[in-house]
UniProtKB/Swiss-Prot annotation:
Keywords: Cytoplasm, Elongation factor, GTP-binding, Nucleotide-binding, Protein biosynthesis. It holds the Pfam family EFG_C. InterPro entries: EFG_II, EFG_III, EFG_III/V, EFG_IV, EFG_V, EFG_V-like, EFTu-like_2, G_TR_CS. Its main location: cytoplasm. This is Elongation factor G. The keyword Acyltransferase does not apply.
């Protein structure tokens, strides 16, 4: 079986390209594909014809929304690349891809260094233990500064960044890079789109600086490797092979992060960074074995071995215009032929894999089989969703699923006609399958459809896709905050439902104790003694509560973080039924509301604003006016960085305010941090607006 492999596991790299929005990730990926012979014409993001950004919305906005997976070949290695979005609204895409990668290239903008979303993706990569190399891009840009970028890695990410190159010049004088191992200069031929370069001895004017930087690099490698340190202190000669091997070990152990320089747009430095992917990033054999669990809950190590039973993770669902529903999978162990059956262990369902595809942005090649360490697209998996485990039917295993954040912002969508309504239902079903942070639901009172997501841009793009891919014309309401409700005071309440209307009546009676359960969600406890509520009705009490909690008690927002203990009640031999106990449970919740100190919770965002110092007063004033709590401040490259916690409801329209108060020089990012009770006055306003019960 293993002899059908085109590339050995040692020569396979699964990497992600990650960065802040606009640092040049997609352009970098484009260049990789160009140099590895995958495309014949280079696409430019700012011209809207980039190969990786294949959805219309991405081409228009010049940002990457979905992580396109593609395969390239470099120096007899296969490199599977996932291009991830840099915009914070698409964090789930980054999380998903990090779960299935073995290594990553972090792209920095040479002028800005580490930016807010760089910090987010870096932290996510730390969580998953993903080794990284860094590509300082845009060295040709005005204000480009390689040393500042390396320093920002140390200071802002506490990362042991080791520069393995130095740039020759910067801004419009940027000509190429000096390799500090071989002490040669790679100078590019502008006319040949960077596919041609000349390796020359280090120019005289750079010799001294290059020597001192090489010394510094050796010292930094010695600090993370005892063998090198011993030779270094003993004044022995250390070969480049030994240095590179030591740096590879340190990179795999997350003790060091090699740094490269270049300009993807100007086609300089990308090939050396590709060498870095091969030299320093792990093959599937170098990473710690992935841990799965068998039916009994025992841990099982998944070794990258084609002869072991098959196990893979479905990490993304996409609707492809040519092949329909496409499931992206990462194979951890074993192999799988197209046409065979797999067990979706998460749902305990057998599914047939019709065809297997190797993806290249949005074109594809059909392949007969996938092996451990591969990333591929599968067609035919109808019930598989993001995060599901696919395994050999004889060896069911559950791989750890993805941690999916709850959406924080909501808008209503009203189809313009009856035909649009039908198309919209299909569209929403497909889009929610593809993106687990996007939800669609119907408000039972008003009948309107509400969609929720991670931010305004996220929802804009989804509405845009409904229009373009599914032809749905719809009117969009104002963005609404996804509030929640909770109880703050323990209380007990009875719910009794009795209805007698000739013949068989209805009877259900329960006493429930409700207690706050902060941060732990909903819990149900059955404390019935002596059968006062018969066994068969207890699940109905639980179900009745969960249903009632969907529409809260104050303003119809979902009720969260409550523990319900059913401790007493009564029943009627003839009239009691599951339905009656369901209603009784919802009445108990309603009756508890007035005594349980119900409050409305609002999402609080972690906001980071970066603005020149002269606007500091205005920026801080504006944050305070938005009920923001300052968390601290730092200096960064001639600007002030302000960290604050601000309620989401106060952040609508902030981008415009910030632009005008800083003359377009301020930027901000925000991520959901936690839920917190609303001030009384705001709670009263929300209840009034929703026609709830104060």
């Amino acid at each position: 079986m293993a002899n059908k492999r085109e590339f050995s596991l040692e020569k396979t790299r699964n990497i992600g390209i990650m960065a802040h929005i606009d640092a040049g990730k997609t352009t970098t990926t484009e260049r990789i594909l160009y140099y590895t012979g995958k495309i014949h014409k280079i696409g430019e993001t700012h011209e809207g014809d980039s190969q990786m950004d294949w959805m219309e919305e991405e081409k228009e906005r010049g940002i990457t929304i979905t992580s396109a997976a593609t395969t390239a070949q470099w120096k007899d290695h296969r490199i599977n690349i996932i291009d991830t979005p840099g915009h914070v609204d698409f964090t789930i895409e980054v999380e998903r891809s990090l779960r299935v990668l073995d290594g990553a290239v972090t792209v920095l903008d040479a002028q800005s260094g580490v930016e807010p979303q760089t910090e987010n993706v870096w932290r996510q990569a730390e969580n998953y233990g993903v080794p990284r190399i860094v590509f300082v891009n845009k060295m040709d840009k005005i204000g480009a500064n390689f040393d500042f970028s390396v320093k920002s890695l140390h200071e802002r990410l506490n990362a042991n960044a080791i520069a393995v190159q130095m740039p020759i010049g910067a801004e419009d004088q940027f000509e190429g890079v000096i390799d500090l191992f071989d002490m040669v200069a790679d100078v590019y031929d502008e006319d040949k789109l960077g596919a041609k370069w000349e390796t020359i001895p280090v120019p005289d004017e750079y010799k001294e600086e290059a020597e001192s930087r090489r010394e510094e690099m050796i010292e930094e490698i010695a600090e993370v490797d005892d063998d090198i340190m011993e030779k270094f202190l003993g004044g022995e000669e250390i070969s480049n092979e030994e240095l590179k091997a030591a740096l590879r070990r340190a990179t795999l152990d997350l003790k060091a992060f090699p740094v490269f320089a270049g300009s993807a747009f100007k086609n300089k430095g990308v090939q050396m960074m590709l060498d870095g992917v091969v030299d320093y990033l792990p093959s599937p054999l170098d990473v710690k074995p992935y841990i799965a669990h068998d039916k009994e809950g025992n841990e099982v190590e998944l070794l990258a071995d084609d002869n072991k039973p098959f196990a893979a993770l479905a990490f993304k669902i996409a609707t492809d215009p040519f092949v329909g529903r496409l499931t992206f999978i990462r194979v951890y162990t074993g192999s799988l032929e197209s046409g065979s059956y797999v067990l979706n262990a998460s749902k305990n369902q057998r599914e047939r894999v019709g065809r297997l595809l190797q993806m290249h942005a949005n074109s594809r090649t059909e392949i007969p089989e996938v092996f451990s360490g591969d990333i591929a697209g599968a067609i035919g998996l109808k019930d598989t969703t993001t995060g599901d485990s696919l395994t050999d039917p004889a060896h069911p295993l559950i791989l750890e699923s993805l941690d999916i954040p709850a959406p924080v912002i909501q808008v209503s969508v009203e189809p313009k006609s009856k035909a649009d309504r039908d198309k919209m239902d299909v569209a929403l079903q497909k889009l929610t399958e593809e993106d687990p942070t996007f939800r669609a639901e119907t408000n039972p009172e008003t009948g309107e459809t509400l969609i929720s997501g991670m931010g305004e841009l996220h929802l804009d793009i989804m509405v845009e896709r409904m229009k373009r891919e599914f032809n749905v014309e719809a009117t969009i309401g104002e963005p609404q905050v996804a509030y929640r409700e909770t109880f703050t005071v323990p209380t007990q309440a009875q719910g009794k439902f009795v209805r007698q209307s000739g013949g068989k009546g209805q009877y259900g009676d329960v006493w429930i104790e409700f207690t706050p359960n902060e941060g732990k969600g909903y819990e149900f406890e059955d404390a019935i003694v002596g059968g006062v509520v018969p066994r068969e009705y207890i699940p109905s009490v639980d179900a009745g509560l969960q249903e009632a909690m969907k529409n809260g008690v104050l303003a119809g927002y979902p009720l969260i973080d409550v523990k319900a203990k059913l401790y007493d009640g009564s029943y009627h031999e003839v009239d009691s039924s599951e339905a009656a106990f369901k209603v009784a449970a919802s009445l108990a919740l309603k009756n508890a509301a007035s005594k349980a100190g119900a409050v409305i919770l609002e999402p609080i965002m972690k906001v980071q604003v970066i603005a020149p110092e002269e606007y500091l007063g205005d920026v801080m004033g504006s944050i305070t006016a938005r009920r923001g709590q300052m968390e601290g401040m730092e200096d960064r490259a001639g600007a002030k960085v302000i960290n604050a916690m601000v309620p989401l409801s106060e952040m609508f329209g902030y981008a415009t305010t910030l632009r005008s108060s800083t003359q377009g020089r301020g930027t901000f990012t925000m991520v959901m941090d936690h839920y917190s009770p609303c001030p009384k006055s705001i709670q009263a306003e929300i209840i009034k607006k929703r026609g709830g019960n104060a």
